[in-house]
């Protein structure tokens, strides 16, 4: 049982932003973790993807599971347990999210020692069936995304966090400063030093806006923080949300900005945002004051992701973005400074 009062965690930027373990080592860790689950004794294990964490498919005669192996030095065990507590509460509120599996000792988090003295945490989840929506489908998919996000926000505002609840902080400093969780955007490939001034001017404008907007409980609280279409599944008409690894304390409107992560420069991005807002408004109201903050939220997220791309350059996701992604960031910053209603798209 966690014994501390609810709290938030500051970043530690002294560690690498990506996991240096090989795929073979990840698979070895997976098999070690699964020893603690009797149902997985004869499991077939397959690596699905690697980003902040490694996600593996675990197939058994009794059913399928997803095993998440955390990279080192990102979340402490207390933070992961807090994520699982929110998932428990969301399930109790009839929102379909991943459910962690207890091992033979009743534990939900495995601690896996490494030869160098380090360790990795692992969590086994029941597999969630569903079709993953993409930005190539009907833009109305973003209405579903907006609607389920509104339900999460409603729950977050009402939920009484248990003692010891602790999650990562997503504010302006931890997102886009040189000491942010994901590093310094200035380190991204393809961004000439001469163009830093445009981004810096943008961030100063955004910083002042965020300071004025404030962090009242109606505007700032526990959010998913990475709720895009790739983390939304639809099964038999039910909308299901996955991948809460980045959940933490942030502005609720940050979840809108996260909805178009990495594709803010896409020609359809404005249409996606409009559809997201329509879906959200079907469940909850967004005030005019909040609507006025959307441009700042969008460009802040894009710069945050620019830092992520810089610090995760070895990942498949970062490599897939191409050589012009950083230059698009500068172009969107210029649109923001010019007062564009939505600093996204072409």
What are these language model-derived features?
Residues 14-17, 305-346:
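ATP/Mg2+ or Mg2+-diphosphate-binding catalytic cores
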Residues 72, 130, 239, 247-249, ...:
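Activation segment
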Residues 1-105, 236, 344-346:
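Conserved NTP-binding catalytic cores of kinases and kinase-like/nucleotidyltransferase enzymes
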Residues 52-62, 66-67, 100, 207-253:
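Active-site acidic catalytic loop and adjacent metal/ATP-binding pocket
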Residues 106, 120-135, 180-190, 303-320:
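A glycine-centered beta->alpha junction motif in the catalytic cores
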């Amino acid at each position: 049982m966690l014994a501390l009062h609810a709290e938030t965690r500051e970043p530690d930027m002294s560690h690498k932003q990506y996991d240096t373990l090989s795929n073979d080592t990840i698979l070895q860790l997976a098999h070690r973790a699964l020893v603690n689950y009797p149902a997985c004794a004869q499991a077939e294990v397959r690596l699905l993807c690697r980003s902040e964490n490694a996600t593996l498919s675990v197939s058994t005669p009794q059913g399928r599971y997803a095993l998440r192996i955390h990279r080192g030095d990102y979340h402490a065990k207390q933070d992961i347990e807090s994520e699982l507590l929110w998932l428990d509460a969301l399930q109790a509120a009839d929102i379909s999210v991943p459910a962690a599996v207890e091992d033979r000792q009743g534990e939900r988090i495995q601690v896996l020692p490494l030869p160098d003295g380090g360790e990795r945490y692992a969590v086994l989840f029941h597999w969630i069936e569903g079709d993953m929506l993409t930005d190539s489908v009907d833009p109305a998919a973003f209405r579903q995304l907006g609607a389920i996000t509104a339900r999460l926000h409603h729950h977050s505002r009402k939920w009484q966090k248990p003692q010891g609840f602790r999650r990562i902080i997503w504010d302006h400093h931890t997102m886009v400063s040189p000491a942010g969780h994901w590093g310094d955007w200035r380190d991204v490939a393809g961004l000439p030093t001469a163009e830093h001034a445009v981004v810096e001017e943008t961030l100063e404008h955004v910083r002042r806006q965020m300071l004025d907007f404030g962090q009242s409980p109606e505007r700032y609280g526990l959010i998913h923080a990475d709720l895009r279409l790739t983390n939304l599944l639809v099964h038999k008409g039910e909308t299901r949300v996955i991948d809460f690894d980045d959940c933490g304390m942030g502005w609720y409107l940050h979840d809108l900005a996260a909805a178009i992560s990495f594709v803010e420069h896409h020609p359809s991005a404005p249409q996606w945002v409009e559809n997201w807002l329509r879906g959200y408004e079907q469940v909850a109201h967004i005030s005019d004051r909040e609507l006025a903050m959307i441009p700042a939220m969008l460009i802040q997220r894009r710069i945050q992701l620019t830092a992520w791309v810089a610090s995760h350059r070895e990942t498949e996701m970062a490599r897939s973005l191409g050589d012009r992604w950083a230059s698009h960031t500068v172009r969107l910053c210029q649109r923001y400074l010019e007062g564009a209603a939505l600093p996204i798209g072409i």
